[in-house]
Amino acid sequence: ADGVRLAHASTVAKKVVMETPEEYLRKNGSYCIYARKAPCAVDTAAVRRTVEALVRQQVPFDFNFDHSSAKALYCTEFVVHVLEQNNCFCFSRLRKRNYMYPNDVLKIISTR
């Protein structure tokens, strides 16, 4: 996977990081990787800039799993936040729940 980088909210690093798939798999005891087409039109360059900014800002992992604020992000919240920052609000309805699970995102994608 030359040049491929995964961006995610890492419980190991305790912040948003970007790393190779090999680094991700080596550092994480449990993992799931979803490669799906965005369910709405997005500017991939803008999404990348948003992700790179979160990495630069060293946004911490949200161990409280509180998606009412973007001061810290957990895995699924990271995906929803990045897309919302780029005018893709298809997952925003998940914010009405106490917790947003990866499966919730997959269900929305599969119905589109």
Identify the meaning behind each predicted range.
Residues 10, 55, 82-83:
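Hydrophobic aliphatic residues
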Residues 52-60:
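The feature captures the short pre-catalytic strand/loop hairpin that immediately precedes
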Residues 1-37, 61-73:
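Glycine-rich catalytic cores of cysteine/serine-nucleophile enzymes that process amide/ester linkages
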Residues 3, 44, 104-105:
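Short linear motifs in intrinsically disordered/low-complexity regions
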Residues 66-112:
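Activation targets extended, charge/polar-rich intrinsically disordered C-terminal tails
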Residues 40-42:
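Surface-exposed beta-loop interaction hotspot
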